[in-house]
């Protein structure tokens, strides 16, 4: 199986390093010509869980990557999911796997754009419940793989295909486990409920460009309590949608070797989190991604299912006041009522579900 990586940020470079170590070098594409040129000319210096100076092969176009690869890892920010899907339209090959690695409703967006073509060509669209590798980029041709989680959820837009996708990925990614649906993977993503309060209560630090540690300095016991309140609402919304999700604390304890009694303890006892730097700008994914793609959908689904979300509403209102942006209006352009089509055992064959969603 040939892997293609879409996006050469820290997570894309981490995936490239991981696959190289596994004896499965990937083809990499990024929308930035400079990033592509740097990687092609100088390769990638990996440190941490993978060590070494690694060669990187790049594709000049998204179409070239699609033509040469069997498994496409979409490692972009959430705002890049739809443009990537539009760029891939008409270029899928039979039997390909398209895997979105940061949830945020990415698989649903891909299905909205590519679903009919994917069904006709036997392609599988999937997403994970978060990033498997915690990584950062010290420099343009560098990546530091801090740690690798022991387990993450994965689901396909067609739940019946999840097992086959897991088997295809298992040689390189044995950490993935089956989720019931892409609603479970997107609603299991706990980054938004974690990052939102941290960003709000450290907004002055971000605005001033200060140097601080995200969890060691930015997550106090009171901030952790706010995270827990948002997480209670996330779980309530998910259960109203018929989706079995676990709490943020349960998921953290699943991902790391030593269980902890509270969210505060889970973050502060993990050395990987203690060295993570906090954002030094308000133009950061904690705001531009986690609010519209993570928290706003919870509010919209809460309204749809009659689940009150006072903590989420308050947090988004404060960000609207500070940033002058309505993040609810920036939520993914999905038919939220139609998401039940992605749940198992809905009666319609996959082609019928996708046609209904496209109408």
Please annotate each region the language model reported:
Residues 1-49:
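NAD(P)+-binding Rossmann beta1-loop-alpha1 motif at the extreme N-terminus of oxidoreductases
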Residues 49-68:
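Short acidic low-complexity segments
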Residues 73-74, 78-141:
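Rossmann-like NAD(P)(H) cofactor-binding subdomain of soluble oxidoreductases
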Residues 139-251:
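Internal alpha-helical scaffold of NAD(P)-dependent oxidoreductase catalytic cores
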Residues 224-359:
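NAD(P)-dependent Rossmann-like dehydrogenase/reductase catalytic/cofactor-binding core
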């Amino acid at each position: 199986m040939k892997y293609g990586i879409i996006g050469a940020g820290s997570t894309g470079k981490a995936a490239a390093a991981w696959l190289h170590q596994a004896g499965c070098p990937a083809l990499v594409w990024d929308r930035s010509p400079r990033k592509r040129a740097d990687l092609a000319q100088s390769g990638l210096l990996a440190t941490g869980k993978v060590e070494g100076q690694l060669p990187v092969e790049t594709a000049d176009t998204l179409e070239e990557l699609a033509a040469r690869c069997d498994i496409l890892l979409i490692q972009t920010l959430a705002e890049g999911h739809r443009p990537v899907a539009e760029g891939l339209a008409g270029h899928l090959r039979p039997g390909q796997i398209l895997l979105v690695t940061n949830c945020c409703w990415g698989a649903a967006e891909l299905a909205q754009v590519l679903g009919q073509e994917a069904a006709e060509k036997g392609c599988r669209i999937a997403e994970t419940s978060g990033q498997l590798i915690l990584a950062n980029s010290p420099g343009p041709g560098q990546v530091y793989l801090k740690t690798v989680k022991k387990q993450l959820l994965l689901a396909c837009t067609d739940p019946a295909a999840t097992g086959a996708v897991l088997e295809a990925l298992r040689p390189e990614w044995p950490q993935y486990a089956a989720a019931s649906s892409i609603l479970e993977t997107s609603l299991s993503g706990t980054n938004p409920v974690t990052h939102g309060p941290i960003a709000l209560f450290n907004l002055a630090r971000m605005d001033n460009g200060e140097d601080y540690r995200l969890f060691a300095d930015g997550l106090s016991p009171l901030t952790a309590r706010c995270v827990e309140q948002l997480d209670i609402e996330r779980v309530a919304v998910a259960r109203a949608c018929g989706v079995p999700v676990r709490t943020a604390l349960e998921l953290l304890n699943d991902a790391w070797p030593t269980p902890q009694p509270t969210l505060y303890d889970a973050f502060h006892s993990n050395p990987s989190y203690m060295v993570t730097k906090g954002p030094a700008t308000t133009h950061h994914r904690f705001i531009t991604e986690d609010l519209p793609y993570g928290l706003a959908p919870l509010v919209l689904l809460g309204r749809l299912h009659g689940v009150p979300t006072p903590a989420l509403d308050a947090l988004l209102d404060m960000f609207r006041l500070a940033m002058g942006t309505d993040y609810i209006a920036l939520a993914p352009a999905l038919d939220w009522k139609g998401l039940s089509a992605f749940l198992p055992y809905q009666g319609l064959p996959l082609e019928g579900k996708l046609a209904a969603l496209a109408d």
